[in-house]
Amino acid sequence: MSDFEPFYDVKHSYEDNYEQGPFGAFAEALKATPSVTSGDSSPYEGEPGKKTSAGAEEKPEEKTAVGAEGEPAGSTFLGQPVNLPFGIPAGPLLNSRFTTAAFRMGFDLATYKTVRSRAWGCNPFPNVLAVHPKSADGSLIPGSAELDEGVLADTNYEQPISISNSFGVPSQSPDVWQPDMRAAIAAAGPGQVLVPSFQGSRVEGMSEEEYIADHATTARLIKETGAKLMVMNTSCPNEGHNRLLCHNPLLVGRITEAVKQEIGDIPLMVKLAYIPSDDDLELMVRSTVGHGTVQGFSTINTISAKLVDADGNQALPGAGRDRSGVCGNAIRGAGLDMVARLAAIREKLGLDFKINGVGGVVSPADYQAYRNAGADSVMSATGAMWDAELARKIKSSIK
């Protein structure tokens, strides 16, 4: 990997990264092409569109994908033309400064960090630690005893890199993220797509119907930014001990029905964690794609593990943080497995949906492995954080 400083600085808080980032090569990319700002524009914008007399942003002109050499002509992501169906998933791109820098570094899919219908705080610092599985290749196996016994986590960031992801899905309030998302959308170049991510927010005393409605409200708020597609996160919301929203396919199906009523024909992708049962995974597909509410799945997010320090104590401070999602090199095998199983279900059921492969992509070979497994598009978070040139390397490898 390259020697670039990570564009998200793990030595600083989420709040500091939001205000001061991105860093490293991403920061240099923004300096190389100064943004054009105006008084009523977002403080985090890249290259905003023209403003109308009323202050509203005009829709940018249609941008034509140029295509990456070696890729099939007419590559798309949920119907939108892309140069290369590769980018960065929800997580490290905190605002439009980050997404704009990602575009300029050649990542043609840039996912705006998951937003909510309300402001939501971040877990205490630190949020990211280096994770060191025991296996020779550094991989974690879903369901293995190691995940419950404890995996070493510290500040020794070694290659191949695996890290904790313990943020709690923070969000700005809509009055902050909506104008910033508009600017992020406008900053996309030809063949590039801003991918908004969202999730519902469960608060104390909320009924299931209110929880479903909160998803629909957040999707509507994204639609108001002019987004042409969106991803709904079902891989983080905690529905109980070690139980995620995506472990309840029938509820996800009900939620996507409500979301689709709000967004209409705008394509919807659902983000999944690792689902070990083929029957449960097929039920997820039948409950969503089978009802016409979902056009794709993005998988995987992380693998949950108990993280410990060298003395066997809880690595991340605070109540309820004995476990964390792990991402990076450690989860590539699980990600490839999920993609291949989803592709097999797609073939079995004869349903048309897209698969976005995520997890442990740190090299051009990893990108190709996901495509070979059945992914229509691929994204990298940890790999991209530690190698800002990753998209360019993948494009150079395709002949």
Task: Cite the ranges covered by each PLM segment.
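N-terminal amphipathic alpha-helix/helix-capping segment at the start of soluble metabolic enzymes
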Residues: 70-87, 178-186
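Glycine/Thr-rich beta-alpha phosphate-binding loop at enzyme active sites
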Residues: 234-250, 284-285, 289-351, 391-393
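Glycine-biased, low-complexity coil/linker segments
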Residues: 45-47, 68
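Active-site entrance/lid segments in N-terminal catalytic domains of soluble metabolic enzymes
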Residues: 2-17, 30, 34, 96-292
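Glycine-rich beta-to-alpha transition loops that act as phosphate-gripper elements at the mouths
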Residues: 90-93, 197-201, 272-276, 352-365
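Glycine-rich phosphate-binding active-site loops on the catalytic face of alpha/beta enzymes
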Residues: 112-118, 296-303, 361, 367-393
